[in-house]
């Protein structure tokens, strides 16, 4: 690994942030494609019930994946901070302790998803025609949760080291295997939603094996010994950083599950249309998401090196990048959303329902560029409790109540329900601007 390229404390901010962000974005694109392939193949070669099952079941899997990713953010930020502070000896202990913690988390999730797959599907209000298939999808994905958690842990480690290219390779391997698996199991053997779930698990397993091989061959600036594999102060510190983010993400994703349940009550076509729209949304949100992940590592290194001015400059640079791309995505989603949804299904009613949701959601692709850049900046400063608070306000006090209100109107439609997301984000921006002003004054006073 060329450590000069992973040093964010000097050189052009725009160049270094962009070069680090591009592989992160590439990995996120492939992850979104990874999930989209399941819907695409099931939509083309499976049943409408199978499509609904993958749509609803993938919401549950997304909940688990996003929560684990936020837990892992604590590891990414802390590794980057140690690098900025030149504390290389602490990194091995952090990784060893984190491995133990994530193994425990995996075991808990495994038991819950296997034992409670049917109640979870019922709670999600999956259409009765798709209830059994949804439970099967959740159960199979639960069986492979160890691989999903391991992938996110390994990716967090590499990104903390300033290496965003390796996680891109990991997910590229998984994406290729998943496509092959879907074509064989769904298109070839007609296993419908179950086949999509099996392909997902197998692809993640191969990806983890590849990642471990790469890690063992890599020359790293630290050592890991068997004595590091225990719960220690370093992994506890990472948990303190990641836990608020994980809690916030958990409740945010639960709100999306609740939204899925609200929409499921509108019928099978609305359920399937929303599922297809979510895949488009996943792609649309990739740039702000990659900005947030990249910003956390970039800012953490500079904070560790004592360069707050550079950290702030990085945040505003990220906003500029995100806004430019966000406008392009906004126009595409708003005016060509029906063409995008038609990629995943040939059923006209489902295409129109998906496009209806995208019309309401479209503004989110612009405003999130600002919000996520600020969130990444705060994460790099260890201000994860605030990130949790502002996220919960958006989720529990704005997005969820507004979505529910829209869903119970006499002529409820997906466009109005989709509006809840950008409205909540705008509220979040206002809150974060206020906190940014407060934090800047506090740091200025402390350094006076």
Which positions does each model-derived feature cover?
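N-terminal transmembrane alpha-helices
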Residues: 8-40, 44-45, 59-73, 78, ...
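Short alpha-helical transmembrane segments in multi-pass integral membrane proteins
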Residues: 1-21, 79-146, 188-243, 299-364, ...
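Helix-terminus/linker motif at the lipid-water interface of multi-pass membrane proteins
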Residues: 29, 33-52, 121-128, 184-191, ...
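Small-residue-rich hydrophobic transmembrane alpha-helices
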Residues: 51-111, 148-167, 273-331, 335-337, ...
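Transmembrane alpha-helix boundary and packing residues in multipass membrane permease domains
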Residues: 24, 28, 40, 77, ...
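Transmembrane helical elements of multi-pass membrane transporters/channels
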Residues: 19-38, 140, 174, 203-207, ...
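Residue-level hotspots within pore-lining transmembrane alpha-helices
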Residues: 26, 30, 34, 64-68, ...
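Short runs within selected transmembrane alpha-helices of multi-pass transporters and secretion channels
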Residues: 72, 141-159, 167-175, 196-209, ...
């Amino acid at each position: 690994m060329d450590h000069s390229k992973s040093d964010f404390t000097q050189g052009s901010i725009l160049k270094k942030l962009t070069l680090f962000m591009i592989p992160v974005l590439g990995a996120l694109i492939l992850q979104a494609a990874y999930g989209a392939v399941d819907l695409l193949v099931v939509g083309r070669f499976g049943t409408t019930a199978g499509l609904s099952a993958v749509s609803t079941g993938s919401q549950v899997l997304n909940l688990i994946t996003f929560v684990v990713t936020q837990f892992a953010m604590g590891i990414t930020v802390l590794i980057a901070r140690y690098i900025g502070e030149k504390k290389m000896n602490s990194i091995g202990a952090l990784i060893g302790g984190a491995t133990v913690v994530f193994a425990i988390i995996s075991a808990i999730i495994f038991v819950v998803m296997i034992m409670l797959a049917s109640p979870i599907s019922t709670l999600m209000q999956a259409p009765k025609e798709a209830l059994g298939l949804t439970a099967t999808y959740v159960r199979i994905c639960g069986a492979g949760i160890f691989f999903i958690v391991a992938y996110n842990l390994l990716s967090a480690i590499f990104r903390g080291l300033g290496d965003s290219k390796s996680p891109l390779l990991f997910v590229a391997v998984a994406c290729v295997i998943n496509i092959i698996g879907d074509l064989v199991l769904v298109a070839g053997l007609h296993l419908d939603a179950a086949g999509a779930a099996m392909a997902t698990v197998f692809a993640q397993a191969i990806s983890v094996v590849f990642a471990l091989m790469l890690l063992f061959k890599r020359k790293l600036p630290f050592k890991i010994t068997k004595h590091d594999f225990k719960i220690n102060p370093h992994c506890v510190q990472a948990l303190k950083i990641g836990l608020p983010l994980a809690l916030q993400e958990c409740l945010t994703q639960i709100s999306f599950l609740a939204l899925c349940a609200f929409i499921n009550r509108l019928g099978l076509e609305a359920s399937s249309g929303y599922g297809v729209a979510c895949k488009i949304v996943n792609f649309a949100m990739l740039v702000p998401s990659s900005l947030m992940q990249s910003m956390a590592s970039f800012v953490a290194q500079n904070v560790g090196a004592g360069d707050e001015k550079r950290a702030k400059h990085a945040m505003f640079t990220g906003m500029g990048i995100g806004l430019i791309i966000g406008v392009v995505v906004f126009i595409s989603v708003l005016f060509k959303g029906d063409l995008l949804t038609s990629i995943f299904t040939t059923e006209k009613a489902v295409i129109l329902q998906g496009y209806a949701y995208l019309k309401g959601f479209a503004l989110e692709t612009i405003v999130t560029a600002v919000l996520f850049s600020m969130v990444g900046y705060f994460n790099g400063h260890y201000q994860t409790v605030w990130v949790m608070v502002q996220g919960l306000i958006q989720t529990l006090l704005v997005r969820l109540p507004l979505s529910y209100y829209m869903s119970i109107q006499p002529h409820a439609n997906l466009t109005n329900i989709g509006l809840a997301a950008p409205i909540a984000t705008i509220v979040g921006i206002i809150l974060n601007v206020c906190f940014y002003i407060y934090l800047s004054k506090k740091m200025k006073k402390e350094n006076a």
